[in-house]
Amino acid sequence: MKGQMTKSKRISLIATFAAIAAILDSIPGIPQFESGVWYSWIFLVVPLFGFILGPVDGFLSILIGVLVGHSIYFRGIHEFLFAIGAPVGAMIAGMLFRQKRSIPIIFFTVLLASYFLTPISWQLPLWGMWDVYLAFIVLLIVTITTFNKSRLLICTFVGLEADILFRIFLLIPLQTYHLFYGFTPEAMKIIWVAGAFVTPIQVGISILFTMIIYPPVQKVVQRTRDNGILSSNTDST
């Protein structure tokens, strides 16, 4: 009975958070953000869900949310593929938040290497991905130091940049910029420059949102989990 109750609570939490994600992903962002990575408001909760639900459940809740959100606010069939970046970001954020650093490091290393081994990347402004480089450097630093005091900030930043890097991996190494959208290298240069300014603003907004929202939301979720455990113990006696 206890195991069933715990599973029921888990499914309920995933469904609840997925509904929130779907709402945020179905609301268009402000026009000034269109040159950034995210076209909706899903970026606000990507790392937050990874922290609260954990890497796996955070991934699932965001994945369900963006699939529903993209169906409501349709951005093109190809965007469903790029939407996977959001749950990946939640997973990486959740792992790092729980001090699991090996997979995030491998993720950043492999995807960055793939990017620089792709010929078109040599034609794009090197500084256009400055925020991704910074996230990788921060990730390497926290592997040899403790970061409890700034854990929330660091994990939020790295999780969002993991989302961005995954989308870049789809766009450049997998060459969907040409296969899906027919972009030329010249067009990609413009996109890279614009994204270098807009996307970090979105990241900053998400960091501020997470720092404010995480503590109260975590308390509510923890209380829900505790109540579920208490209820299951009561039922089993």
Indicate residue ranges for each PLM-predicted region.
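Loop-helix junctions at membrane interfaces
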Residues: 1-237
